[in-house]
Every structure is written in C-alpha cells, then in structure tokens.
C-alpha cells in the first residue's frame, strides 16, 4: 500500500507500537495528549530512507522490475509548553501516505510494439504524495488525565501513467486538500 511507516528512528525501533505512549514531539500525530509529558520545548526531525524493489515474472517467464527503489520520507515535529506548563502546543509536518512505483521500460512494461505483456493492463508509473500539517494543543483535564486536540490539514496528489493501445499513453493526475481532526 501507500501508507508510510511510522516517523522517526525511535518509533521505527518500536515497530510502530507507539500510539498509547510517545515520549517525544511526534506524539502530535497519534496521541497529542502525550505532549503534556514533555516539560521543555522539543523538536524532532526525521528523514527516513525506504528501499522498495519489486520483480514480477508472468506465467510465460517474462520478467519486469521496478526502478528508482529509494524513497525518502521526511517528518518534522515541534512542541512547546506554554502558560506555566498548563498547555503544550505543537506542530507536525509529515507525509503519512505517499510512495511511488515505476516499472523499467523493459520486460513486461516495454513500450515497444508487440513487447511487454503488461504494457496495456496496468500503470507503469503510479505515485501518491501527501503532506500533512497538524497543529495541536494539549492540556490537563485533571491530575491524572490529559487531553489533546489536533487539526489535520492534508494535501495530496495522485499520478498514474499507462500505455494505451495501439501506441498511446494515458496520464491521470489529481490533487486535493482535506481537513480532519485527531485527539
């Protein structure tokens, strides 16, 4: 799928098991109430490399493989206690979804006539890009209970490229902005 792995080395090391308790500014996107555990301003920046390589072999033995296997997933989070530590405000900027898949112009995806058994059946390029901006605020409801609220503003762009019979090419692009919330 296009869901990106969890952000940051610490959270990756925890195998994504970070929703219940996060002890850094990346709590902004999953559990902003945890920001109340942070007693000083904090900035967390990550630039996670991801390697995705796919090889396909059909029933007749023809093969195809992807190119541009390295992807880079940036994320940045900042939080700061305010008003005598009664509130913590935060801002997260991440890419929660978005990877691409591009098949080499050879084998099953060759764009030469009468080659490429997959040429007309599936996109040879697909890409989903997203940017999530997530301002948050956290506060204590009682001595033992904290609450956090966040606004999710997400931009996305989707692109597909596919060969069309007999020698054409179809490109579809779409983008949009959505809003939501997290707590």
Task: List each model region and its residues.
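Transmembrane beta-barrel outer-membrane domains
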Residues: 23, 65-73, 124-130, 178-183
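Residue-level signature of outer-membrane beta-barrel architecture
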Residues: 36, 80-82, 139-140, 151-153
């Amino acid at each position: 799928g296009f869901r990106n792995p969890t952000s940051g080395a610490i959270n990756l090391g925890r195998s994504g098991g970070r929703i219940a308790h996060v002890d850094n500014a990346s709590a902004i996107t999953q559990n902003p109430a945890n920001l109340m555990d942070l007693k000083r301003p904090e900035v967390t920046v990550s630039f996670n490399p991801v390697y995705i390589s796919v090889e396909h072999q059909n029933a007749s033995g023809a093969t195809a493989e992807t190119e541009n296997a390295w992807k880079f997933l940036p994320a940045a989070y900042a939080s700061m206690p305010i008003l005598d530590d009664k509130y913590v405000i935060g801002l997260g900027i991440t890419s929660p979804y978005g990877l691409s898949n591009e098949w080499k112009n050879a084998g099953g995806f060759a764009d030469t006539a009468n080659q490429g058994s997959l040429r007309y059946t599936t996109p040879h390029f697909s890409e989903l890009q997203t940017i999530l901006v997530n301002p948050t605020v956290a506060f204590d409801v009682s001595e033992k209970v904290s609450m956090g609220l966040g606004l999710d503003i997400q931009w996305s762009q989707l692109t597909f490229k596919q060969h069309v019979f007999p020698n054409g090419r179809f490109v579809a692009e779409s983008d949009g902005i959505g809003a939501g919330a997290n707590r």
